[in-house]
Amino acid sequence: MALSLLIAPAAAAGKQLKVIGAGMGRTGTDSLRTALNELGFKTYHMCELLGICNEGGTRAPSPLEMLGFEGGHNELWAEVNRNITAGVEPDFSFLTDEFNAAVDFPSAAFWPELLKAYPNAKVVLTVRDPHKLYKSISNAWCHIIGAGTLLDQAVTEITFNRPWGRWNRAMQIEWAKATGRLVGVPGFTWVQACNDEAYAVAAFKAWDAKVKATVPADQLLVFETGKHGYTELAAFLGVKAPTTPYPHTNSTAEFTFVLFIFRFLALLTVGVPALLACCCLRCCLRRGGAKPKTKRG
């Protein structure tokens, strides 16, 4: 079915986005997703793209899931970015048809447009020390998008199947454009951010500053991960705070486990054919170097 380029009304069919997560990934966005769901919201997160959402936090994808990966809503988000670039109001109905809250990438990269479409939404800006954020991203995202070792590059280029590689490249192109637009850095790339701490930290600071300067104070909660919890979040959203502890999910350690699976599959993809090739070559060399048998007279 062709993707629609029609301008979407701000309040289509009465479906509204009630909460917009404007914080960068790795600032506690999955914990926020889990908390919002506990408070009664239905929350969109990048894990929806990957199909690895759990109520108690994201989980590692299975090899079969990665082999069948098709990219979820990625093309819809790419179209959102293209429409914004072309000056066309994006259509977020694919989001609000099922969800009433959205956090993390890719939705966080479009928080200004989401707020314009849903002006009554509350905005939660999850924040973190920018240098600690850089360390977390460099230990997690950067490996997944192939900005790390050669083995990490193999993850994005030759493991699983072609759709994963296409998704990764689309993510880097479209989401980097959206990020660059927000932080005022035309040509921004996540690969450079992964390899240049000063470049990345400047972008993180610019991102947070733009949110704080744009969103009306009565609609914005600056949520410091590790310091704030249900008390602040529930009061801001006008709901009752649960008695359970605020969740802590998708930590760097958990992300490392996902990365281990990716690297293991990459190693199988590269290592097994290489091992077979070496064995075949060795057999050929042995045969080629064998001495012919001579008859005894």
Where do the protein language model's features map onto the residues?
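PAPS-dependent sulfotransferase catalytic core
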Residues: L5-P90, V155-K177, A241-A274
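Short, well-ordered alpha-helical microsegments
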Residues: T29, S107-P112, Y134, G229-L233
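The conserved 3'-phosphoadenosine-5'-phosphosulfate
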Residues: N54, V124-I137, W141, D152-A154, ...
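PAPS-dependent sulfotransferase catalytic domain
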Residues: A60, L64-E65, P112-D196, V239
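Glycine-rich phosphate-binding loop used to anchor ATP phosphates in small-molecule kinases
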Residues: F94-E113, Y118, T126
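Alpha-helical transmembrane segments
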Residues: V272-R286
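Short, low-complexity, Lys/Arg-enriched N-terminal segments of secretory-pathway carbohydrate enzymes
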Residues: A290-G297
